[in-house]
Regions:
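Conserved mixed alpha/beta catalytic, RNA-binding, or beta-rich assembly cores of soluble enzyme
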Residues: 5-187
């Protein structure tokens, strides 16, 4: 069992809402001169879930799940920057308004540049959400440390997710981290 400082990290309540899908508002042109327009960042993406293939979708930088923001008009300012920093992979996210009120999901991570926090919910929950709904994230994980491995730095990781990762201590002060998929270096 990995020893951590999980009992001493700060936990915030963070509020966000789904952000509508974004577009450049223009068509792009491929290397053969063909115009195209593809779905991109943001939105409530109904048909992509955790575990689906990352490649092969007719999209560009599509975010699976629900792309959330605290402020769609000022994504790089407070309170959205706090949402970005304090929400961590594995944090519990609860819908607190609308038809999906009470539904629980989990933070997948962030999409830098778009300043979105991406939350995974089952499809049936996503189908009930609207862009005015409110979601509360229990932000915890920043400051998490491994007591016996101070050279390993943890960022954006909920301690409960760390515990579920089945990481084992191996000989020679090493950790064995299970891997489920090998992603090729070139797409």
């Amino acid at each position: 069992m990995l020893r951590t400082n999980a009992s001493r990290i700060v936990e915030f309540l963070l509020q966000c809402q789904p952000g509508p899908p974004r577009t450049r508002g223009t068509w792009s042109v491929d290397r053969d001169g063909q115009p195209f327009a593809l779905p991109s960042i943001g939105g409530i993406t109904l048909n992509m879930q955790v575990g689906d293939p990352a490649f092969g979708w007719a999209g560009d930088h599509v975010e699976p799940g629900v792309s959330c923001t605290a402020d769609t008009k000022n994504p790089r300012e407070h309170p959205n920057n706090s949402l970005q920093v304090y929400s961590c992979a594995g944090n519990v996210a609860t819908v607190v308004s609308g038809e999906a009120k009470g539904a629980v999901g989990y933070v997948l991570g962030h999409h830098g540049g778009s300043e979105h926090v991406i939350v995974d919910f089952p499809r049936e929950v996503k189908e009930q959400l609207i862009y005015d709904d409110k979601i509360i994230i229990r932000g915890r994980g920043q400051g998490l440390e491994l007591h016996d491995y101070p050279e390993i730095l943890l960022y954006n990781l909920d301690p409960d997710l760390l515990a579920k990762m089945a990481i084992e201590e191996a000989e020679g002060d090493r950790l064995r981290v299970p891997v489920t998929t090998m992603v090729p270096a070139a797409c």
